[in-house]
Design a protein with these regions (language model features):
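Conserved ABC ATPase "signature" region
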Residues: 52-70, 89
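Conserved ABC transporter NBD signature motif
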Residues: 2-18
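Helix N-cap at the start of a conserved alpha-helix in ABC-type nucleotide-binding domains
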Residues: 107-109
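Q-loop/switch helix immediately C-terminal to the Walker
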Residues: 26, 31-49, 54-57
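A short, proline-enriched helix->beta-strand linker immediately N-terminal to the Walker B motif
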Residues: 90-95
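Catalytic Walker B motif of ABC-type/P-loop ATPase nucleotide-binding domains
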Residues: 96-100, 105
């Protein structure tokens, strides 16, 4: 029996919801909603206040000329993955826990994601991730599991 702490506090539901964001492989969005509706829903459940210019700038970081009125079920696997990463960026909790964030992404998006990770780490954020790809970040620690 034991406990896990974060910033010298035992992690409970409140601390977990305020400080941690998990993005996994499972479906995280509603198929029948548009991208825009999914973004607004995701931000509302995480109590994130945003304005449209920040949202649009973030959308353009991962998507070039994507119609936000497109339904989620119409997206490719890679586009769905980009939406996950966009939501990660918009919610921006101190600790990100990610399951294989690079799968299904094109080269340009992987570069953008690495840049996003670098900025997160520069700002004293924490990223815990599992990946099948080689990671090309600076100043990170790895634990190789086989």
């Amino acid at each position: 029996e034991g406990s896990i702490t974060y910033n010298n506090l035992v992690i409970d539901n409140h601390i977990a919801s305020q400080s941690f964001l998990y993005i996994g492989e499972t479906n995280f969005a509603h198929d029948s909603l548009t991208l825009n509706q999914n973004i607004e829903y995701w931000l509302s459940i995480h109590n994130v206040k945003f304005n449209n210019s920040i949202k649009n700038k973030s959308v353009n970081y991962f998507f070039q000329e994507l119609n936000l009125d497109k339904k989620f079920y119409q997206l490719s696997f890679g586009q769905k993955k980009k939406l996950q990463l966009l939501l990660l960026m918009l919610v921006n909790k101190p600790v990100w826990i990610l399951d294989d964030p690079f799968s299904g992404l094109d080269d340009r998006t992987i570069i953008n994601l690495n840049t996003l990770f670098e900025k997160k780490l520069e700002n004293k954020g924490i990223i815990i991730l599992a990946s099948h790809q080689n990671i090309t970040l600076n100043n990170y620690k790895t634990l190789q599991l086989t």
